[in-house]
Amino acid sequence: MTEKYRPVRDIKPAPAAMQSTKQAGHPVFRSVVAFVSVLVLLVSGLGYLAVGKVDGVASGNLNLGGGRGIQDGNAADGATDILLVGSDSRSDAQGNTLTEEELAMLRAGDEENDNTDTIMVIRVPNDGSSATAVSIPRDTYIHDDDYGNMKINGVYGAYKDARRAELMEQGFTNESELETRAKDAGREGLIDAVSDLTGITVDHYAEVGLLGFVLLTDAVGGVEVCLNNAVDEPLSGANFPAGRQTLGGSDALSYVRQRHDLPRGDLDRIVRQQSYMASLVNQVLSSGTLTNPAKLSALADAVTRSVVIDEGWEIMSFATQLQNLAGGNVTFATIPVTSIDGTGDYGESVVTIDVNQVHAFFQEALGEAEPAPEDGSDDQSADQAPDLSEVEVHVLNASYVEGLANGIAAQLQELGYSIAETGNAAEGLYYESQILAAEEDSAKALAISEALGGLPIVANSSLDDNTVIVVSAGDYAGPTAEANAVTSSTVGQPGADVGEPIESPEFDAGGDGPRCVN
């Protein structure tokens, strides 16, 4: 174990969801929450896209293939995973530098850094019945293969700057083209980092800049929020009294960007963002915004100026899918952390995490993991158990975690299995952990799946009944022996503060007003 990878204490369990907090609005929209409004506005979904109001949304040239796991509009794993990003950018979606007047609206200073201070993974099932939105703190400390240990909000900028330098060396001089191509590299780097951290495959990408946030908020006439206490924090420009109030675009941006002088820092800022988005949906869906031509025009202009989505995303069909979410359930959550006052390699303050625990959290939160059976509940009796000596197991590593296949193989050997081979999977062939067997209901494969935490079994007709291939990708969160290197995926030195166990609320569009927050 190298010095930069230090042991970490047991992670604090992720907070349970508290009782749903009602938001003001017409009852028909009671279960339509922040997620819907953000995607509706950012990717021109319901309403104005459906009637052709927006046709100029920028598309990033991202290697998502129109959604890696999307076929005929449906995700192969049953749900679409979207990476939603708020970029601290001083240029628009077309790469043009913002005007002095527009920069003044942002209250964010003149320094160009392209940090991604809002990172959220959103899962929408194919039937549109529910959705889960998981926030990733901006200071989450990760290991990147190209740039080492760093905060996740700096990944975008690191890859963007490197690509920009390469393009300039190649003779590119057009500023707009430079900016656009460099940003695409930043997006690719962030997509890979989020996939490694969460263990999921990103199907689609949506990004909005600071200007877009201001313009979208102003387009709907402002958003109502509520504060527990008055705040005056000059770094973000947040200067608001306690209680309920309606904020315009610039003030709303300060409201969701403040993290200093808050009890839990970035974690409280995430709560603000989630509460703001819940109020936004009420403003959009209960005030006739989508039937107001003037507001639709303003929304269309805001989207065109500041929103980027991945190339190949069929927005029209996705908008139709979102309409079914009105009667469903949307939940907000935040990834579990090991501390909020950790220390990075250069002494900087960071949020520390354990990748294994984050993978497990996403499997449970996004409905990908089956709960472990209770003692005595296993349906397979002793006389039905397969003869371990007959099983030939191959273990392939399709992740970035060095030694993962060896750790899994050692775990299976301890259980009595014969390991025929360990090695690396062909690059790009597998994105999710799985077990390959002759048949999906193979008793031998089922036994190995149970031993490894419930990995899905995929039938492969080229295999005989005694051969099983275990593929461990970035989402693997099952057991391993100590021979693996999964524990080395924790970086930074955890601090003493794991944050107060404040429950994550579920928001809906009903009730008497916005939830008051710190």
Swiss-Prot record:
Disruption phenotype: Essential, it cannot be deleted. Conditional silencing of the gene results in severe growth defects and drastic morphological changes. The lcpA-silencing strain contains significantly less mycolic acids and a reduced amount of arabinogalactan. Gene3D superfamilies: 3.30.70.2390, LCP protein (3.40.630.190). Changing D88A: Does not complement the growth defect of the lcpA-silencing strain. InterPro entries: LytR/CpsA/Psr_C, LytR/CpsA/Psr_CW_biosynth, LytR_CpsA_psr. Residues 1-31 are cytoplasmic. Keywords: Cell inner membrane, Cell membrane, Cell wall biogenesis/degradation, Membrane, Transmembrane, Transmembrane helix. Belongs to the LytR/CpsA/Psr (LCP) family. The chain crosses the membrane at residues 32-52. It comes from Corynebacterium glutamicum (strain ATCC 13032 / DSM 20300 / JCM 1318 / BCRC 11384 / CCUG 27702 / LMG 3730 / NBRC 12168 / NCIMB 10025 / NRRL B-2784 / 534). This is Cell wall biosynthesis protein LcpA. One of its GO terms (biological process) is cell wall organization. It comes from the Bacteria. Involved in cell wall biosynthesis. May be responsible for the transfer of arabinogalactan onto peptidoglycan. In vitro, has pyrophosphatase activity. Both the C-terminal LCP and LytR_C regions are essential for function. The N-terminal region is not strictly required. Residues 485-518 are annotated as: Disordered. Pfam families: LytR_C (PF13399), LytR_cpsA_psr (PF03816).
